[in-house]
């Protein structure tokens, strides 16, 4: 029987039965029924760090709650399978995976040690580590991929998972990417990719930290400390975006190649951020407060824009202590300016400003003289940066 009433997720439901004698008269009443906890049809609560998925019914969220298997618990693996098998409400509202693990924190985290790769996510889902009651300002749900196999990814947002959110997880020690995205309009916020749950120990992932492979309009990070991702210690790139369908992505407010304080060297093995040929309209940083990324300690380039990738604004970022150039268009070293800026290429090989002098009073005022030789009748935003140490290339 479907009843209409306002009941919160987790409230306990019980009942009595009373003989109806008719005419508004009633007879004997029973005791209270065995209670059951109310569940929201699109919310699954993970309550164990176990990676077990045997014996349970993962054919739907409702089926999983009815049959959790012999351990009586719901693992993250079971939750993802059940969410994949449950149609989104109204065809659009994502299922949600929450956490309520009763065990004490060990090393500041509830660590889920995976024996194999988690299932790919096949439809919209919100995996929200911040729902765990132990959550403070940093993740307490950690996914450890050290035992999952060399090709395992941490989270794989596959085709069909458009509109998903991954929030508040530490994802480390996977053989492949920490997060791999092939779908659109996903939000990745508040995750520590490649560190422990407190963001103080570099653990890395075997390929890229975050890999957008054809996905469009994804948002990585945000303008607040809560939304900031740490992406560190990857064998390859911190963030890589590839394929011409990867249009309109935004990379905002992240710490890339460093720790939670933004000071330690947790550098990625290649580039901090890499945009491959065909990628357009991917915004790295921004003009609003908090949107700039910190990109540091890369073994390669800070930000690399390659091939035919163009119309990719890079704004308001702190780019420092990288082995290669801070920004490298075409990934070939410093590109000389050309008269009129007519040459094509990565970000249209936009000419850089030429600074002829910079005079400071040592406290509050600096006078900068310079010019930019570029496309006529076009408005430009010129950003200035200062550092106590010059880039070895003299550019940056």
Language-model features: where?
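Tandem-repeat/low-complexity and Cys-motif detector
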Residues: 183, 209-212, 240-245, 272-276
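Generic alpha-helical hydrophobic packing signal
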Residues: 187, 191, 212-213, 219, ...
